Curated annotation (Swiss-Prot):
<protein>
    <recommendedName>
        <fullName>Norbelladine synthase</fullName>
        <ecNumber>4.2.1.-</ecNumber>
    </recommendedName>
</protein>
<dbReference type="GO" id="GO:0005737">
    <property type="term" value="C:cytoplasm"/>
</dbReference>
<dbReference type="GO" id="GO:0009738">
    <property type="term" value="P:abscisic acid-activated signaling pathway"/>
</dbReference>
<feature type="binding site">
    <location>
        <begin position="68"/>
        <end position="71"/>
    </location>
    <ligand>
        <name>tyramine</name>
    </ligand>
</feature>
<dbReference type="GO" id="GO:0005634">
    <property type="term" value="C:nucleus"/>
</dbReference>
<comment type="pathway">
    <text>Alkaloid biosynthesis.</text>
</comment>
<dbReference type="InterPro" id="IPR050279">
    <property type="entry name" value="Plant_def-hormone_signal"/>
</dbReference>
<dbReference type="InterPro" id="IPR000916">
    <property type="entry name" value="Bet_v_I/MLP"/>
</dbReference>
<keyword id="KW-0017">Alkaloid metabolism</keyword>
<dbReference type="GO" id="GO:0009820">
    <property type="term" value="P:alkaloid metabolic process"/>
</dbReference>
<dbReference type="InterPro" id="IPR023393">
    <property type="entry name" value="START-like_dom_sf"/>
</dbReference>
<dbReference type="GO" id="GO:0006952">
    <property type="term" value="P:defense response"/>
</dbReference>
<dbReference type="GO" id="GO:0004864">
    <property type="term" value="F:protein phosphatase inhibitor activity"/>
</dbReference>
<dbReference type="Pfam" id="PF00407">
    <property type="entry name" value="Bet_v_1"/>
</dbReference>
<dbReference type="GO" id="GO:0038023">
    <property type="term" value="F:signaling receptor activity"/>
</dbReference>
<comment type="function">
    <text>Catalyzes the condensation of tyramine and 3,4-dihydroxybenzaldehyde (3,4-DHBA) to form norbelladine, the common precursor to all Amaryllidaceae alkaloids such as galanthamine, lycorine and haemanthamine, and including haemanthamine- and crinamine-type alkaloids, promising anticancer agents.</text>
</comment>
<dbReference type="GO" id="GO:0010427">
    <property type="term" value="F:abscisic acid binding"/>
</dbReference>
Length: 163
C-alpha cells in the first residue's frame, strides 16, 4: 500500500534564509537542540551534509515503538529549495514500512514570507497496512515551527543590537 501526506507551514522569513538552514546539517543540529523532548541526538555517520549523507536520529524517550532511524539525503536541489531523505534503517521501517521518504521544500511567498512544505511518501506491506496511520508530517511541522521561531528570535536580537 502506497500513500503520501503533505503539510504547509507559512512563516515570516525569506525563503533564502530558511534554505540556508534546511539545505545543510544545521537543520538536524537545530532539531536536536531546540526539541530535546522529541529528538535526543543526531549523529552524522557519513558525509558532509550533501547528497549521500547518512544521519542517525535518536528519538527522545517516550516515543512509542521507535527508538531511532537512519536517513540518507538522496536529493538536494538548491534552485528549487528541495531536499529529500530516505529512511534506510529503523523508525517506520521497523513498523512494516518498506519505504519512507521525506521531502522538504521551501517555497517563496513574498519578500519576507515563505512556506515550508513537508511531504512524506511511504509504502507499507499489506500485512502491516494498519500501521499506515503512523505515517505523519507532524514532526516536520514541529521542527519547522521551532526553527523558524529560532531564526525570527535571532533576527530580532540582531535588530535590537543595532539600535
Amino acid at each position: 500500500m502506497k500513500g503520501s501526506l503533505s503539510h504547509e507551514l507559512e512563516v515570516s522569513l525569506p525563503a533564502d534564509q530558511l534554505w540556508q538552514v534546511y539545505s545543510t546539517l544545521r537543520l538536524a543540529q537545530l532539531s536536536a537542540e531546540l526539541l530535546p523532548t522529541v529528538i535526543s541526538k543526531v549523529e552524522v555517520e557519513e558525509g558532509d551534509g550533501g547528497v549521500g549523507t547518512l544521519l542517525r536520529v535518536t528519538y527522545a524517550l517516550g516515543i512509542p515503538g521507535m527508538k531511532y532511524h537512519k536517513e540518507r539525503f538522496v536529493k538536494i536541489d538548491h534552485e528549487k529549495r528541495l531536499k529529500e531523505a530516505l529512511f534506510v534503517e529503523g523508525g517506520h521501517l521497523d513498523l512494516g514500512f518498506s519505504s519512507y521518504l521525506i521531502r522538504l521544500e521551501i517555497l517563496e511567498k513574498g519578500h519576507n514570507s515563505s512556506v515550508i512544505k513537508s511531504t512524506v511518501e511511504y509504502e507499507v506491506d499489506e500485512e502491516h497496512a494498519a500501521n499506515a496511520s503512523f505515517a505523519t508530517t507532524d514532526p516536520f511541522m514541529i521542527i519547522g515551527g521551532a526553527v523558524s521561531e529560532h531564526l525570527l528570535q535571532k533576527k530580532s536580537n540582531c535588530s535590537i543590537m543595532l539600535l
